[in-house]
Curated annotation (Swiss-Prot):
Associates with the EF-Tu.GDP complex and induces the exchange of GDP to GTP. It remains bound to the aminoacyl-tRNA.EF-Tu.GTP complex up to the GTP hydrolysis stage on the ribosome. One of its GO terms (cellular component) is cytoplasm. One of its GO terms (molecular function) is translation elongation factor activity. SUPFAM superfamilies: Elongation factor Ts (EF-Ts), dimerisation domain (SSF54713), UBA-like (SSF46934). This is Elongation factor Ts. It comes from Paramagnetospirillum magneticum (strain ATCC 700264 / AMB-1). InterPro entries: EF-Ts_dimer_sf (IPR036402), Transl_elong_EFTs/EF1B (IPR001816), Transl_elong_EFTs/EF1B_dimer (IPR014039), Transl_elong_Ts_CS (IPR018101), UBA-like_sf (IPR009060). Residues 80-83 are annotated as: Involved in Mg(2+) ion dislocation from EF-Tu. Transmembrane segments: none annotated.
Length: 312
């Protein structure tokens, strides 16, 4: 029997797109014969994944996992919304979130980690799912929040299963106060994040280029009024404060009570539980944001296959 070398496995992976463990098994089953191993993988449906890799995957699920002082959000994409309702796919996304909670948010480290409940790593299990379900899929991104004391609270908007949905949010609250109350308010703020979509945690971390751009626009708008420079400066500063209220979580008006800023909500919570509460971080994953979806022109597609031009 031929030795199953790393170069043989690499060659088979490049030719088929199948996972490393599947390639090793195929070569073992075929005495190291690459061509026979390709056929073996094709019969098992595992070589099909490579053909699907070029297709746009903008659907799928966001997965959330939180435990005490840490929480994670992951996004796993597929081609159609139908796959999001598949039990195998849902189980995989939940597993990826569990791995990220343990291993951290580095996507490559997550892919290399063992996938719970399988004999494969996450990357190979993903390849297996692609072949089984028949759609291109990808582990797109992950984020993990952690505090030394306090909670990382979570919320999934319109969850289709526990911890799974199309928008997932995390809020990190640092405090030595009552954990139950921190969790309760933290979840409400996570709901706020889902609805209000803040861009920054607080004014201190607003991107300077974004702020400069906003200030330039507002200054030009104010100058058009013809008012004195001192008045214009006050107008611009007022509008900058308004800008902070729109984009900074700490400055936004809490959607639950429609009255207090988030910073005030946490100040009041700190008084209630007898310990200061710091807004330490947040994350909001919306499924498919930033992915350019293909718009199919069916007539053009058929015409291209037929070698003709569409009428019209």
């Amino acid at each position: 029997m031929a030795e199953i070398t790393a170069s043989l496995v690499k060659e088979l992976r490049e030719k088929t797109g199948a996972g490393m463990m599947d390639c090793k098994k195929a070569l073992g089953e075929t005495a190291g014969d690459v061509e026979a191993a390709i056929d073996w993988l094709r019969k098992k449906g595992l070589a099909a994944a490579a053909k699907k890799a070029g297709r746009v995957a903008a659907e799928g699920l966001v997965g959330i996992a939180a435990a005490g002082t840490k929480g994670v959000a992951v996004e796993v994409n597929a081609e159609t919304d139908f796959v999001a309702r598949n039990d195998q796919f849902q189980g995989f996304v939940a597993s990826v979130a569990a791995v990220a909670l343990d291993k951290g948010a580095d996507v490559e480290a997550i892919k290399a980690a063992a996938c719970p409940g399988t004999d494969k790593n996450v990357a190979d299990q993903l390849t297996h799912l692609i072949a089984t379900i028949g759609e291109n899929m990808s582990l797109r991104r992950a984020v993990r929040l952690e505090v030394s004391a306090g909670v990382v609270a979570s919320y999934v908007h319109t969850a289709i299963a526990p911890g799974l949905g199309k928008i997932g949010c995390l809020v990190a609250l640092e405090s030595t106060g009552n954990v139950d109350r921190l969790n309760e308010v933290g979840k409400q703020i996570a709901m706020h994040v889902a609805a209000a979509n803040p861009l920054f945690l607080d004014p201190s971390v607003v991107d300077t280029s974004a702020l400069d751009r906003e200030r330039n626009v507002l200054t030009e708008q104010a100058q058009a009024s013809g008012k004195p420079a001192a008045v214009i400066e006050k107008m611009v500063e007022g509008r900058i404060r308004k800008y902070y209220e729109e984009v900074c979580l700490s400055e936004q008006v809490f959607v639950i009570d429609q009255e207090n800023k988030i910073s005030k909500v946490l100040e009041n919570l700190g008084k209630e539980i007898g310990a200061p509460v710091k807004l330490a971080g947040f994350a909001r994953f919306a499924l498919g944001e930033g992915i350019e979806k293909e718009v199919s022109d069916f007539a053009a597609e058929v015409a291209a296959q037929a070698g003709t031009r569409p009428a019209g």
